Amino acid sequence: MKKIFMLMAALFTISATAFGQAKKPTIMVVPDDAWFVRNGYTQEFDNMGVKTIVPDFDRAFLENADVEVMVSAMADFMAAEGFPIVSLKQELKRLKNESAEMAMMTGKNEGGMIAETPIERLRRSAKADIILNLDFNIKKVGPRKQIEFNLQAIDAYSSKIISGNQGTSSEVSTTASNITVLQESVLSFKDNFIRGLENHFADLFENGREISVTLFRYDSCEIDFQEEFEINGDYYELADIIDAWFAEETVEGRYSLESSSANRMRFNQVRIPIYTVNPINGKEQAMDANAFGKRIANKLKKNYNLVVGVTPKGLGEVWITIGDK
């Protein structure tokens, strides 16, 4: 009986150690779009001729003292739970100081444009696995105050909601720290929230990340996606060949061909490995949509001698162009 008990204790220790050492997703805490709109911190962005409203991070962090405090408090809370954190403020500063900002790409020969919104660029640069969108509103209730909050965990690649919660803190003195009020509120649902994040990350390891891939043909390209090529005595359209490549390169062949025409192909729910080996230095690195797109582009270049361009839109989407870069 004693041996059985010792064996069970040993197994429990091994299991607990393995769980504690399991890799956790990298997190970046970002104010929710609703917060920016409600507080008037927005700006217009020209997305390929379409005017869209995007957050004005610079002005918000410069003029609003609460936003940096609340974002930092949430980041500290998650860091205390063992999650690696990407600092939003430092990432914004780094992007601002880059000499060559990639706000849009213009085709070298044809003048085609592929635009990336500021938030897409932020996600691609930060490479966090999960974005924590934090919306909060500090309200006065007579001589006291309370904080309304909405916390959502978003997969940075697929933009799907993983976990979340919303609520209102208890009424506290106006002198009480907003940090303390927020963290005490989050404690009430912490376990289920974090379990949702860890379960999602475990699913990614087993089934791969989810991304989207779009292929375009420029008018300058002599062939289109319906052009036929001979393989082992049979003829297949280029679209069918690309489709077969996706079956090879995805995790257990998991992807969906949403649409296909002579000039455009759109794949979604594309499951790619979390990690890949860099072909240049042989080292393991995180896989994103851009890296996956380059794999497909290299096949097009090698097999059909095409001019191919690869442009990321955030972490989870990539555009591949044939006939121009």
Regions found by a protein language model. Give the residues of each.
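C-terminal/domain-edge helix-coil "capping" segments
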Residues: Q21-E44, K160-R254, F292, N298, ...
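Short amphipathic beta-strand and strand-loop transition segments with alternating hydrophobic
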Residues: D135-K139, R254-S260, V308-V310
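Bacterial Sec-dependent N-terminal signal peptides
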Residues: M1-K23
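N-terminal segment of the mature soluble domain
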Residues: Q43-A126, I131, Y235-N303
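Extracytoplasmic/secreted cell-surface and envelope-processing proteins
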Residues: V37-G40, L95-S99, V141-R144, E222-I223
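Extracytoplasmic
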Residues: A22-K24, A65, V69, A73, ...
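Amphipathic beta-strand/beta-sheet edge segments enriched in Tyr/Trp
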Residues: I130-A176, L315-K325
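Active-site-proximal beta-strand/loop segments in catalytic clefts of secreted hydrolases
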Residues: V30-D33, L88-Q90, D135-N137
